[in-house]
Amino acid sequence: MSAFVTCGATVPFPALVEAVLAPEFVGCLSREGYRVLCVQFGRGYDFEAQFTSVTCTRMPLESAEVSELRQLVRDERVTVMGYKVQDVVVLGFAYSNNILQIIDRYGDVVISHAGTGSILDSLRLNKKLIVVVNHTLMDNHQKQIAEKFQNLGHILATNPTAIELCDAMKRLKHEDLIPLSSETNTEFMERLKSIAYS
């Protein structure tokens, strides 16, 4: 199984990246049967620096795992990195215009920042979704959005710590999340507008 993490492409979310790369969380993934963790960390973030104090092995660019993600990213300007941490392959890239295919490939579970676009992308692909609120943002509409989607039963919402993410992963096994309707839903669109503008 694979877990996909998206921080969005525009606003860095270092707390989320650090939480998912923490040994406690990688260990939790391993115990839950996940073998790949793919992280879209956003522009301007030093992903490699996160591995200086972690026991890991850098994977060669020509390895099957790194090569597959490079093909999905479809942009030679974007560096794709891979590390073996414990028994989990950790892949990372800054951004991609092909994000839906990447979510579809690596998202047995998706851990996302609380941006509406990323939430809807994952829900439209019928992915199990854990949403993490970036509390450093001013006028934190992300919290309202995450709470509303959670109250509707579509997602689990949590905070950017390894312990809380592990707890959310365990809860996810027992939650029956409600899929988002695939048809155009005027009621849902109005509800989303009211959340975004309230």
UniProtKB/Swiss-Prot annotation:
Q: Where in the cell is it found?
A: Endoplasmic reticulum
Q: Supply the alphabetized keyword list.
A: Endoplasmic reticulum, Glycosyltransferase, Transferase
Q: Which domain of life is it from?
A: Eukaryota
Tell me its EC number(s), please: 2.4.1.141
Record bears the keyword Endoplasmic reticulum:
yes
Q: Which GO terms describe its biological process?
A: dolichol-linked oligosaccharide biosynthetic process
Enzyme superclass (EC): transferase
**Principal subcellular localisation of the protein:** endoplasmic reticulum
> InterPro entries, alphabetically?
Glyco_trans_28_C (IPR007235), UDP-GlcNAc_transferase (IPR052474)
Query: Which GO terms of the molecular function aspect are on file?
Result: identical protein binding; N-acetylglucosaminyldiphosphodolichol N-acetylglucosaminyltransferase activity
An example GO CC term for this entry is:
cytoplasmic side of Golgi membrane
Q: Report the sequence similarity comment from the record.
A: Belongs to the glycosyltransferase 28 family.
Q: Any idea what this protein is called?
A: UDP-N-acetylglucosamine transferase subunit ALG13
Query: What organism is recorded for this protein?
Result: Candida glabrata (strain ATCC 2001 / BCRC 20586 / JCM 3761 / NBRC 0622 / NRRL Y-65 / CBS 138) (Yeast)
Question: What is the taxonomic lineage of the source species?
Answer: Eukaryota, Fungi, Dikarya, Ascomycota, Saccharomycotina
